[in-house]
Amino acid sequence: GLLNARLALTIYMEFKKNAKKSYHLQLKIANAIVPELLGVLDESAERMLPARWVNLAANSKVLPSSKDLFSVQAVSGKNSKVWMHTHGMTRCHMTELEILESDQANYNNHFNLLSIYAMYCLDKGEAFDPRIESAYIGQLINGYPVVVTCRSWTEAIFEYKKLQLGGEK
């Protein structure tokens, strides 16, 4: 199995204008070089891809979804606080996204929010700059719009009065 493998192949690829095409090419290269692969570690997105999925995606005429280009991770801390963040966006020339101080009651909603916003950014590509434009990404059950604004963490950090980064002291 995968844990007993003695060889590994690393492919590093900076994605160009069309991130989905670049990712598809990366999967095709991995599948062609190692046709009997056990799996692919997508290091940028920090996730394992099953060999069967890689083979199907590489041989498909349909490009992978934008949701395949990144992952959303949740790190829980004290007081039920959860730090949510993406991995894989920077290879697409986009900023990684995060939500600080989510909580146990809302982290699933925040996971969906980050996922939808990341897909929105990737699908828009270079035509959209999240640092300048807001994005309407949906509507709540009560009819209120969901509008997302991306802010640099160096600015947004001041909105968290009691937040401590990097440890307890």
Identify the residue ranges that each predicted region occupies.
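Internal, hydrophobic cores of structured domains that mediate oligomerization or house catalytic pockets
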Residues: G1-V75
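Aromatic/basic-lined ligand-recognition segments
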Residues: M48-K169
